[in-house]
Amino acid sequence: MPYRKYREKKYETKYREAFKVFQEKIGITFTDEKLLIQAFTHSSYVNEHRKKPHEDNERLEFLGDAVLELTVSQYLFQKYPTMSEGELTKLRAAIVCEPSLVRFANELSFGSLVLLGKGEEMTGGRERPALLADVFEAFIGALYLDQGLETVWEFLKEIVYPKINEGAFSHVMDYKSQLQELIQRDGSGNVEYQILQEKGPAHNREFVSRVTLNNVALGLGSGKSKKEAEQQAAAEALKKLKEQL
């Protein structure tokens, strides 16, 4: 056997073993392992191995992007029943953006599994954020094709959803949503808002709102609308609660 073929065979054996260990790590065994390998195959690797029937991960990335948006959307819709469409959209965008996907990928050492061409390898492709984010989406696409939406949901429940529950994306929420998330996380009870006062002429009204937790006042706020007053009350409540932590 020519040395080049021997080297390539050894390389592929090494990667197949790595994928076996990876599946054991995440507790998922692919029915079609070719899909798993494809999810981690960069176009640069395919370009350098044209004589072999390799397929890159770009189509799986396309599919995974849609599956990820759907599953995260469903989770947020169920978790935050009072959150507005605009706030849900902002929160979802923060969860599926490139830096977040890179974080998820790095937690599972996705970079070490990627099949790269020599040029891409030499220029640091294995650690390139855009590449890692694409691989994470491609993996979701492969998992969906191989085992369906339920398994994708279970995987995200281990890797992604806990970050939401820990408040990793709270910075993109409005004050009311942040307060609601904090209270839910601690299991402290129910938050309620009450308009205490409306004052001023019709063209220049001012509202005063109070937010309570289990009938205990947490914050007061005022604004030109009920919504603004509630947001300010929530902001004051958040400040107080964070000082106590």
Swiss-Prot record:
InterPro entries: dsRBD_dom (IPR014720), RNase_III (IPR011907), RNase_III_dom (IPR000999), RNase_III_sf (IPR036389)
Reactions catalysed, as given in the entry: Endonucleolytic cleavage to 5'-phosphomonoester
Active site: D65, E137
CDD domains for this protein: DSRM_RNAse_III_family, RIBOc
Disulfide bridge map: none
Name of the gene encoding the protein in the UniProt record: rnc
Protein name, entry field: Ribonuclease 3
Domain DRBM: 174-243
Stored Pfam families: dsrm, Ribonucleas_3_3
SMART domains to which the protein is assigned, alphabetical: DSRM, RIBOc
Chain coiled-coil ranges: none
Organism listed in the record: Bacillus cereus (strain ATCC 14579 / DSM 31 / CCUG 7414 / JCM 2152 / NBRC 15305 / NCIMB 9373 / NCTC 2599 / NRRL B-3711)
Principal place of residence: cytoplasm
GO biological processes: mRNA processing; regulation of gene expression; RNA processing; rRNA processing; tRNA processing
Subunit structure: Homodimer.
Molecular functions per Gene Ontology: double-stranded RNA binding; metal ion binding; ribonuclease III activity; rRNA binding
UniProt function note: Digests double-stranded RNA. Involved in the processing of primary rRNA transcript to yield the immediate precursors to the large and small rRNAs (23S and 16S). Processes some mRNAs, and tRNAs when they are encoded in the rRNA operon. Processes pre-crRNA and tracrRNA of type II CRISPR loci if present in the organism.
